[in-house]
């Protein structure tokens, strides 16, 4: 997993290439390490950037351990299937809590400046749907995203937030 996290932080390759390497050319963590060693260690500039990425991965792993959150690589069976099919899914997800609630997602999309009606709609929706096995998903943006997330949490519903910048 540390190799995948290092690959996440390795900015010299586009995400498309990283995913191609992970899913088409390697079968295991050891295969990935061997592949990267062959490709990266032949170029001093890439080698320095790879070492920086490994250091960032180490720091992030320690931070996750201290703060109690987990790191889920795209190769994990727990990685949300729906997220794998978007054009550019993240190599890793950072989270706190359980990954089991990522099934049956419902996202509410709206403005960053909701009206009273919009906020009330979020409250009523959370009240009505919290009795069902639905996972309220948001990006925690200001406005409707945050409102539905907060209301769902107040009702004890399962929630998942995907943060663009990580934790």
Predicted regions mapped to residue ranges:
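Phosphate/pyrophosphate-binding betaalpha-module
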Residues: 126, 133-137, 141-167
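Short, positively charged patches
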Residues: 1-127
